[in-house]
Regions:
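A short helix->loop->beta-strand "cap" motif at the edges of active sites that frequently abuts
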Residues: 110, 166, 312-316
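Phosphate-binding active sites in nucleotide-utilizing proteins
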Residues: 237-312
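Internal gly/pro-rich beta-alpha loop/helix module
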Residues: 122-231
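Amide-donor transfer/coupling interface in amidating biosynthetic enzymes
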Residues: 179-226, 235-236, 348-434
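Cysteine-nucleophile active-site neighborhood
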Residues: 290-362
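ATP-dependent carboxylate-amine ligase catalytic core
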Residues: 2-108, 112, 116-142, 152-156
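Residues that mark the start of a beta-strand
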Residues: 6, 34-37, 238, 264, ...
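Structural motif
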Residues: 8, 87-89, 113-115, 145, ...
Length: 434
């Protein structure tokens, strides 16, 4: 059973500084020569990009619903075999959601660090820390870190207020040079933050003066029951994948699955007007921010021509969210300006000022459920009838996302987690029916 020092970084709510602290810890321990593996709770794409920049290693999603307990167990056990430290960043507040960050921490016995923003707060900090530590008796609790502290005197007030059996891990001062900027789907992508490495190093410098600079106790991660090797259902298939600032919402586990199924992966950038590799058998257009680059994408004739030629040849195209928007006739922004897109999927996408959809999704296929999630601000108006529709497995408000087919194209707003159904993923890229 592989074992590795591990911490679960959580908070009483969103906006407390979990990502800044997790990224700072990853950068700190990496600078100390340690191999750091970071995971992000939930289906988010943006936080993992920043955490990858900090740690120097791919960041996988951990989610008891989307990834499944066995999938999470396999990812953690694999990381524990090679890493010197595992960090898991939670989502929302520690006990929010079903399943929650606390459920994940308890399932794998990972001790929790509570990051609490103390701006405009003093002794109430201790009450919040006490509640987080005691609300659930089986929760392994490591200690508490005060964030956005105003002064040394402020830090001392906070420390003195803590009950004696709650560990004070230290504090992070209020510092605009550490905070990470945000945009409408969450944090900015790493390449959009000019001084990102300086911010990460500043956070690491501050955290070096806390107890979190020390390695925590090791956690043993039991491996899941051995499963047989995956069939090489995509052996010899060459799959082209769009990857750049406009199309970046890609789970590392999805790429690993395609590789395990035998596919050869090749990447290209529509934003840089690169063609689809000419001998590709299938194409994946992931989600991202096409709305921020609509004019450039519309002007890039080389990429557009290659994608249209791929479709005309009847080769499979799988498009999710922003990738689906790129295939539409046109994209209209929040100010009413319309930009032509590829015209391969009948319909128009229109950006909204508020969420159009958010939540977990499950799509029933011929080979069982495919899990994933949805998170978008655009609305699609299309004459196409859905060939399938996902459902909300969490019972949340709103309907499941539609799946559309137009020729060799399969498109949906749903971001699929392909390891939840490898056979369906193989069918998608083979042009089969899912």
């Amino acid at each position: 059973m592989p074992a590795c020092p591990a911490l679960f970084v959580s908070a009483p709510a969103s906006g407390q500084g979990k990502t800044s602290v997790t990224a700072g810890l990853a950068r700190l321990h990496r600078r100390l020569g340690r191999r750091v593996r970071v995971f992000k709770t939930g289906p988010d794409f943006l936080d993992p990009m920043l955490l990858e920049r900090a740690s120097g290693a791919p960041v996988n999603a951990l989610d008891l619903g989307m990834v499944g307990e066995a999938g999470c167990r396999a990812l953690l056990a694999d990381a524990a075999r090679d890493a010197d430290l595992i960090l898991i960043e939670g989502v929302m507040g520690l006990f929010d959601g079903t399943p929650s960050s606390a459920d994940l921490a308890v399932a794998f016995g990972v001790p929790v660090v509570a990051v609490i923003s103390v701006k405009s707060m003093a002794q109430t900090f201790a009450a919040i820390a006490f509640g987080l530590a005691r609300f659930r008796a089986d929760l392994p609790f490591h200690g508490v870190l005060a964030n956005r502290v105003g002064s040394a005197r402020h830090a001392e007030l906070l420390r003195q207020a803590l009950p004696g059996d709650l560990r004070w891990l230290g504090h992070v001062p209020a510092d605009a040079g550490i905070a990470l900027p945000e945009r409408h789907l969450g944090l900015h992508q790493p390449n959009d933050i000019d001084d990102l490495d300086a911010r990460l190093d500043r956070a690491a410098d501050v955290l070096a003066n806390t107890a979190l600079a020390e390695l925590p106790p090791a956690v043993a991660f039991a491996e899941p029951d051995a499963a047989g090797p995956l069939p090489r259902a995509l052996a010899g298939k060459r799959i082209a994948i769009a990857r750049d600032a406009a199309f970046s919402f890609i789970y590392p586990a999805n790429l690993a699955l395609l590789d395990a199924l035998g596919a050869q992966l090749r990447f290209f950038s529509p934003l840089a007007d690169e063609p689809v590799p000419g001998d590709s058998d299938a194409l994946f257009l992931p989600g991202g921010y096409p709305e921020l680059h609509a004019a450039a994408l519309a002007a890039n004739a080389t990429s557009a021509g290659a994608i249209r030629a791929h479709a005309a040849a009847g080769k499979p195209i799988v498009a999710e969210c922003g990738g689906m928007v790129y295939l539409c006739d046109a994209l209209t922004d929040v100010d009413g300006a319309t930009t032509p897109m590829l015209g391969l999927l009948p319909g128009r996408a229109t950006m909204q000022r508020r969420f159009a959809a958010l939540g977990m999704q499950q799509l029933d296929t011929r080979t069982g459920p495919m899990r994933g999630h949805t998170f978008h601000y655009s609305r699609l108006d299309t004459p196409l009838e859905p060939v399938a529709a996902a459902v909300r497995p969490d019972g949340g408000a709103g309907s499941g996302e539609a799946v559309y087919r137009a020729g060799s194209i399969v498109a949906t707003y749903m971001h699929m987690y392909w390891p939840s159904n490898p056979a369906a993923a193989a069918a998608l890229f083979s042009g089969g029916t899912i």
